[in-house]
Amino acid sequence: MVAKAYYFKGEYIEAKKTLDFIKNKYKKTEIAFESELWIAKCYIALEDYNFAESILDELRAKKRFPDKLNKELLLTFADLYIKQEVFSDALDELKSACNLIKRKSKKARYYYIIAQIYQDAGNSKQSKKYFELVLDANPEYDMVFNAKMNLARTLRTKKDLNQMKEKLLKMIKDEKNKDYLDQIYYTLGEMNIIEKDTTTAVENYSLSTKHSVENDIQKSLSFLQLGQIYYKKSEYPTSKIFYDSAYTFMPEIHQFYENTKETKEILEKLV
């Protein structure tokens, strides 16, 4: 469909024009309903959330709305709520969408989003549950890897932490993970922090920086963690070195950039 091509190129106004034409030409047909759904997506992309929600509400209320489009309607609602940061409603829509998907492998992506929402909310129990569902769905390796890294951060009991550390250490030896070593060592460092073992955390964060060749964001986060550890110890000269490095590698659009910059400037005055 030409309209979808416009949409995926980011040309939302052109996409909406085409979709409006289709909706009006083929009224009360399945393609008309689908066009309205994509018009709502365009409004979401344009950040006109109120108008997008009004379209979606109207579609949900229509008795003739095709069953085969229900999953996409739920996922579009979820996207809208995530953009608005109404995460409780987003979770409801995502879970309902998962109930309509039969193949586990197709559910993996949405389980992952659900897990991330719970993780960001600090709900380790539910986050752990959904990251485990991601792994159970046996998706592509990149998602498996990221789910394992995030799952490790949800663990709290000594038994769970030790079991996961064993798995991560095995992953380090696996050739297919050679490009992910920076993330594995970083995750080990995160687990060390949970255990209040800052000495080992420093070792793992340092290894993360050494193995981070092309991933500047990961490198910056590892340096940032090192900077924070030494800052809390009041070892300001050492902390400054790591904050300088974190600031150097961190892109300006990163959520931690401004805070990193401020702390770096404070350390410049202290040292």
Residue ranges, per PLM feature:
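Acidic, polar-rich low-complexity tracts and alpha-helical solenoid repeat scaffolds
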Residues: M1-V271
